[in-house]
Regions:
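Phosphate/Mg2+-binding loops and adjacent switch elements
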Residues: 87-195
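Walker A (P-loop) phosphate-binding motif
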Residues: 36-88, 180, 212
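A transmembrane-helix-recognition feature enriched in membrane-embedded lipid enzymes
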Residues: 2-48
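Short, Lys/Arg-enriched, disordered terminal segments
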Residues: 1-17, 40, 73-78, 117-119, ...
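Short beta-strand/turn micro-motifs composed of small residues
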Residues: 52, 83, 143, 177, ...
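Acidic anion/phosphate-binding donor-loop and adjacent secondary structure
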Residues: 207-215
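Beta-strand-loop-alpha "switch" segments that mediate conformational coupling across diverse proteins
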Residues: 200-208
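Hydrophobic anchor at the start of a short beta-strand
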Residues: 77-79, 139, 200
């Protein structure tokens, strides 16, 4: 099922509707607290990288997953991509299958087991930062600076799966840039205030094969 994102989520400041919905963020807050206290398992047989987001919506994580896969492959690493199976994410799974070596299962633990069985060296997960059972070796958060964190509130009051302060527990940020250099600086400054040690990488996207269309 595809859910259309509410317009008020991406307003720079919370409006009346987002404030009214604040009490409904409590279950997500409790869930996030529990995840932080649960014991997670780190695999000793394979290196795991998770590329995900805390903003619900397009942040460029799948294109970045493909790019990182190809870079590691070119460097000679035996790498594979993992994607938890969701029936409504067929398009993403098809893109990944066409561009990478892909493992899909209904559980991320099964994906790890299959990658180990196939004697892979590195496993890149597309999505899964909020996974309860796995401790990844490297956790990367993707953002689009056009929307950034929207109104800054959690779902359903805003677009965030976790509070922005959760950047403290992540290793790197990949920021899809806009043409506004001042906006890029402001977001970078905000990220560094939360986690001075986090690595920040900047990306941009260029359309290819436009000659295929009769424009």
């Amino acid at each position: 099922m595809i859910i259309k994102k509410p317009i008020f989520w991406d307003k720079k400041r919370p409006d009346l509707l987002s404030i009214i919905l604040l009490p409904f963020t409590i279950p997500l807050i409790i869930n996030n607290i529990l995840i932080n206290f649960l014991s997670k398992e780190k695999s000793k047989e394979i290196k795991t990288i998770c590329i995900g987001n805390i903003y619900l919506g397009g942040t460029g994580k799948t294109p970045f997953t493909i790019k990182l896969y190809k870079i590691l492959k070119k460097l000679g690493h035996n790498v594979v991509v993992g994607k938890k199976y969701y029936k409504n994410q067929y398009d993403e799974q098809t893109i990944l299958k066409n561009e990478t070596t892909l493992i899909t299962e209904k559980s991320r633990k099964k994906i790890i087991d299959k990658a180990i069985k196939n004697k892979k060296e590195i496993l890149i997960f597309d999505d899964g930062l909020q996974e309860r059972k796995i401790e990844y070796d490297l956790k990367i958060v993707c953002f689009d600076n056009q929307n950034w964190i929207g109104n800054g509130h959690l779902i359903p009051s805003g677009p965030l799966r976790e509070r922005i302060k959760s950047l403290k527990k992540y290793d790197a940020v990949v920021l899809k840039q806009s043409m506004d250099s001042e906006e890029n600086k402001e977001i970078t400054h905000e990220i560094n205030k939360i986690n001075p040690n986090i690595k920040i990488f900047y990306t941009y996207y260029t359309p290819l094969n436009l000659d295929m269309f009769d424009l």
